[in-house]
Amino acid sequence: MDIISSYSPIHVVGGGLAGSEAAWQIASAGVPVILHEMRGVRGTDAHKTDGLAELVCSNSFRSDDATSNAVGVIHAEMRMAGSLIMAAADRHQVPAGGALAVDRDGFSDAVTRAIHDHPLITVMREEITGLPPSDWDLAIVATGPLTAPSLAAAIQAETGEDSLAFFDAIAPIVYRESIDMDICWYQSRYDKVGPGGTGKDYINCPMDEAQYNAFVNALIAGDTVGFKEWEGTPYFDGCLPIEVMAERGRETLRHGPMKPMGLTNAHNPTVKAYAVVQLRQDNALGTLYNMVGFQTKLKYGAQAEIFRMIPGLENAEFARLGGLHRNTYINSPTLLDPSLTLKSRPGLRFAGQITGCEGYVESASVGLMAGRFAAAERKGEAISLPPATTALGSLLGHITGGHIVTDEEPGKRSFQPMNINFGLFPELEPGSIVKPEGVKRFRGKDKTIMKRQLIARRALADCAAWLGQTRTLAERA
């Protein structure tokens, strides 16, 4: 059945997870969409089919536990918002324990069929070689990590040479509450006070010589992940994996990212550390700290085991583990406004992995938000942002401004791709965590589990309220 709409179409460039979700959200709001996808005309080094929302790597959407896992929470919020990606994933799930894994072909076929069958969506198989022309007054770029070189060059020309990255160099991120401050201490090197700093901007983890040598041995022996053939990613100055630096000489690390100079152990000031691992605040909330200079190609299991050898990180919980990949993403915190619009080009939004989110559902969720925002703008409705207390809102807030931008490490950019995790959510109100009756000791893992359950419960309630409010605003417009 044909549906006639009086609205001009919104253009979406890229038919991956984010672009497909954005197109679906726009069409679901009654606005026509033209979805441009180059596969079918021009392939990529990683994709195998012409299907929309093809899963290039894993077939897992990770945990589906919405009671105490941040990924499960964003799954639930996307379902509430009518996500096509989640509906297709649910229909084509395969057994995977507590995770949501899918039959990749069935999933992609379902998304492709739904997009093609929607009367308000037109799919055009063509390569877009530049930024959208002026007559595309509203558009979304969702071209992902394998953005075509010509379009990437156009984005770079519009936003500036340093605004677009072609590789990510991800260092692990640790939850602040899991760091042992009886061993670690706050201090900037030489007590330097930088812009917005206090002279105590880093958390420092000391090592003696024996600990350092054991750590270097573990790094050299650790299992690593090789580059995929299509990545062709070279190592470059300023972003060597930590294990590669260790292989270049036993003293390399303690004269590089683990140098102890300018630091005094607050717990034992008369003893000079042989080496020091520094962690820097990563988000404005102060809940996440990244391991400075620790980008790595170690396998995830090896990372957790080896990095917990660091004094003070024995019980570390990781919000994100490290990696080094081919990727194309913009410096979103400086380029995008809170509605994902490019500040220099009103009407042009970015969505998905190109914004600096990491993961299938994260990419789709940013597409979901970009699509809803663009549809509201087309219809003349007020753009309603998801609350920061929701998974959608916390991820959006981090991408568009929650990350703390630093420039003290030449050759590196501080903004790196981020997955959804509880460290992005605002803290609970004081007094929210109450010890259960009859429990004598309530701390550590038990307290963390309750905290996450409360954050998840708050997120889902606030998301439901936001979606209800958004529907009301649309009805009034």
Curated annotation (Swiss-Prot):
Top EC class, one word: transferase
Compartments it resides in: Cytoplasm
GO molecular function, one term: flavin adenine dinucleotide binding
Catalytic activity field: uridine(54) in tRNA + (6R)-5,10-methylene-5,6,7,8-tetrahydrofolate + NADH + H(+) = 5-methyluridine(54) in tRNA + (6S)-5,6,7,8-tetrahydrofolate + NAD(+); uridine(54) in tRNA + (6R)-5,10-methylene-5,6,7,8-tetrahydrofolate + NADPH + H(+) = 5-methyluridine(54) in tRNA + (6S)-5,6,7,8-tetrahydrofolate + NADP(+)
Alphabetized Pfam families for the sequence: GIDA (PF01134)
EC number, as in UniProt: 2.1.1.74
Cofactor(s) it depends on: FAD
A GO BP annotation: tRNA methylation
Principal location class: cytoplasm
Coiled coil, from the record: none
PROSITE patterns associated with the record: GIDA_2
Keywords in alphabetical order: Cytoplasm, FAD, Flavoprotein, Methyltransferase, NAD, NADP, Transferase, tRNA processing
Keyword set includes Metal-binding: no
Record-level GO cellular component terms: cytosol
Annotated residues for binding of FAD: G14, G15, G16, L17, A18, G19
Function, as annotated: Catalyzes the folate-dependent formation of 5-methyl-uridine at position 54 (M-5-U54) in all tRNAs.
Protein family membership: Belongs to the MnmG family. TrmFO subfamily.
Protein name per Swiss-Prot or TrEMBL: Methylenetetrahydrofolate--tRNA-(uracil-5-)-methyltransferase TrmFO
